[in-house]
Structures are given as structure tokens and as C-alpha cells.
Amino acid sequence: MSDAEATAPRSSWRFAGRDEDDQPSLREVNSTIAVPSSGVWFRRLFAFMGPGYMVSVGYMDPGNWATDLAGGAQFGYTLLFVIMLSNLMAILLQALAARLGIATGRDLAQACRAYYPRPVNFVLWIACELAIIACDLAEVIGTAIALKLLFGIPLIGGAILTALDAFLVLLLMNKGFRYLEAFVIALLIIIFSCFAIQIFVAAPPAGTILHSMFVPSSEIVTNPAMLYIAIGIIGATVMPHNLYLHSSIVQTRAYERTEKGKRDAIKWATTDSTIALMLALFVNAAILIVSAVAFHNTGHQDVAEIDQAFELLSPLLGLGIASILFAVALLASGLNSTVTATLAGQIIMEGFLRLRIPNWARRLLTRGLAIVPVVVVTALYGEKGTGQLLVFSQVILSMQLPFAVVPLVQFVSDKKKMGNLAIPRGVAALAWVVAAIILVLNFKLLYDTLFGVG
């Protein structure tokens, strides 16, 4: 095979050859974004800014909206501490994912394929694909609800229309990865702005907010209903596909592939994801705060559905466009999640199976598998069934989480894989504690959901 043949992009469905095992993740965009090796800190941070914001999208999807709305409506500001705690856990795990990708030059899926036997990898791949479909399911539902609220499009029609976003992703990818990142960041700014306006109008008590965010209430664990919502918030926080995604897209930066260059890249990539996840913290906290002010404080504690919140926000907050801002933010969230789910699906399929397929085929396949259940359930059971399907998608994501968290913490703790860039023992111990907490709470959420507890 000539050099030209080896580097030329291929659009057909095929399994990569053995000679391509060392090919980087997302090789068409790997090392395509220049980074300065010196200069003012802001220029260097700006060069690395992007992957963290793409990852943060998964922390604001419709599954998070549902739990935050319910938490604020039922329990006021009390669960803000849980949102803060879950966000700190996410910051740690995403930093580890970035470290793995930069230190080894492999994404999490490639690292799993190299380490585990084939049967284990097959199980991991199936679990990942189910998680991608579940994530896409939430995005289809969220986008369809937003289209209905804004334009009156029926849920079934809105769900079918979401297939068109496949072409948006392809257009942006063809223009360059930086354009894709810019699109995501622009939509994040829209989401942030919508909730900043609503927070300003709601005017919550700052002292109470800060106290609830940093001082936990014993009621969180003594009140079964509150504990159930708290587990739901944590369970919906760390998206398993985000760990695969982040370990890959940090490699789009053309940092020096030396130990010094990698250490520098880890520092800036971690800074990028930490700032982006603080934005996600604001959005999730804002959803809960607005819900608490508009619903909990006005006797509407039973509000749990997104469309209920839309109907009540404007009259309760006294701002005519409050409901519109809410729906616009939901639409932006759904569109954004589309981009990251597409990339994660490509990374997982190439990493585990070495199967390379055209981006348009990957997108339409994943989105098609998500649209079908939404259309069928909506046709048979109406909008209530769609809401239950949204909850079910979060349960599927919870089931997949162990298959991403455990290998990640195992790999970044391994000096044979990471060399001098392996995490220190103290960080490893903390990571295992965080992993254990998330796994236990997710399994409890799964049990409670299946058996009707809470």
C-alpha cells in the first residue's frame, strides 16, 4: 500500500486492516488544530478550548432537565448540593478521560480493545451502542418536545424531522473540526443566555442558594422521595459515551507528542473541560432554581414534565417570553447533543470493531434506531408514554456506566500503559471512590425504577 493510499480517506464500509491498528482515533481530524508551544496563557488555553464544551453538552441533555425540574419543584433549593457534588465527580472523570487520550494516543475504546479479550470487548461494544441509542433517544424526545412547544409540530412529526440533523453534522465536519466546536459553543451560549435571563427575573435569594449548594441537608438521605431524585440527578450526570468521546477529541490538537508536550496538553485540556463543566453546573443549577421559584414556592410541587413547565413558567415568573426561552434552550440542547452522539458512535465503532463506515450512514443508523421507538410509543400511548420513554433512556444509560468508568480508572492508574503520566495513588483512590459512588447510586436508581420505588 502506498503512502497516498494509506492516508486517503475511504468512504466505504470496511474493517480496518491489521496494519492500521496504530492509526489514531478520528484520524481525519487528529492533530489538525495547531497549538502554540509558548506565549501568553490565554492564547494557549484558546487553542485547547473546544473538546470540553463538546463534552459538557452531555450534562445538559433532556434527561438532566427532567430530574432538575422535578427536584426544584418538589424540594426547592435543597438538592443544589447534589448538583454541585455530581458536577465535581464529572470534572474528575472527564479529566481522566482527557489524560488517557493524550498520554496513550488512544481513545478509551481503542485502549479496551488492546487490553481485554475479544468476548469482553464485544460485550463492551454492545453496551456502548445501547448507551448511544439511549442518549439519542433522549435527544429525539427533547428536540421533538421543543419543536412542539415552539411551532406546534406534533411529537411524531418532530421526531421524524430530527433525522435531518444528520446532514448538519456532515456539513460542519466537512468544513473542519473547529467549525463543529464553534457550532456547539454557539448553542451553549444560547442555552446559558436563556437561563441567565430567567434567573435574573426569578431573583432567587442568593444566601439561600449558596447555603443549599455548599451545605448538605440530612433530609437528602432521610427523605426517601428526595433521595430518589438525588440519585436520579447523579445518575444522569456522567454520560458514559462522554468518556469515550473526550479521550478521542482531545487528540485533535497538534501538541508535541513528547512527555513534556503531553503534560502541557493534559494541563490545558483539563482546564478547558473544567471551565466547560462549570457552565454545565450553572445550567443544571439554573433549571432547578427556576423550577423552585416558579413551582415549589407557588404551590405547584407536582410539576415534573417539560411541557408542564413550559405552560406555567411565563405566568408564574411574570415574564411573557420565559416559556419561549425555556423551549429555545431545550431545542439548542437537543441539537447540540446530536453532534456529540454522532462522534461518540463513530469513535466506539472504530475503536472496538475497527469498522469504518461513512459518517452519514453512522448518523442515520443511530438516529433511525432512536426515532422508531419514539414514533411507536407516541402513536400507541401518547405524550405520557413519551415521557416514560425519556426516563427509560436514562435507566439504559445508568446500566452502561460501569462499562466506561471501571476501564477508564483502571487504565489511567496503570503505569505500564501511562508511564510517568499515570495518576498518583491519592488521585487513583479518589477516582475509585467516585466510581464506586456513581455505580452504587446508578444500580439503586435502576432497581428503584424497575420496581417502582420512590
UniProtKB/Swiss-Prot annotation:
The keyword Metal-binding does not apply. One of its GO terms (cellular component) is plasma membrane. The chain crosses the membrane at residues 45-65, 78-98, 122-142, 153-173, 182-202, 220-240, 275-295, 312-332, 368-388, 389-409, 426-446. Residues 1-21 are annotated as: Disordered. GO terms for biological process: iron ion transmembrane transport. It holds the Pfam family Nramp. GO terms for molecular function: cadmium ion transmembrane transporter activity; manganese ion transmembrane transporter activity; metal ion binding; symporter activity. It is a multi-pass membrane protein. Keywords: Cell inner membrane, Cell membrane, Ion transport, Membrane, Symport, Transmembrane, Transmembrane helix, Transport. Its main location: membrane. It is found in: Cell inner membrane. PANTHER family: NATURAL RESISTANCE-ASSOCIATED MACROPHAGE PROTEIN 2 (PTHR11706:SF33), SOLUTE CARRIER PROTEIN FAMILY 11 MEMBER (PTHR11706). HAMAP family: NRAMP. H(+)-stimulated, divalent metal cation uptake system. Belongs to the NRAMP family. This is Divalent metal cation transporter MntH. It comes from Mesorhizobium japonicum (strain LMG 29417 / CECT 9101 / MAFF 303099) (Mesorhizobium loti (strain MAFF 303099)). The gene is mntH.
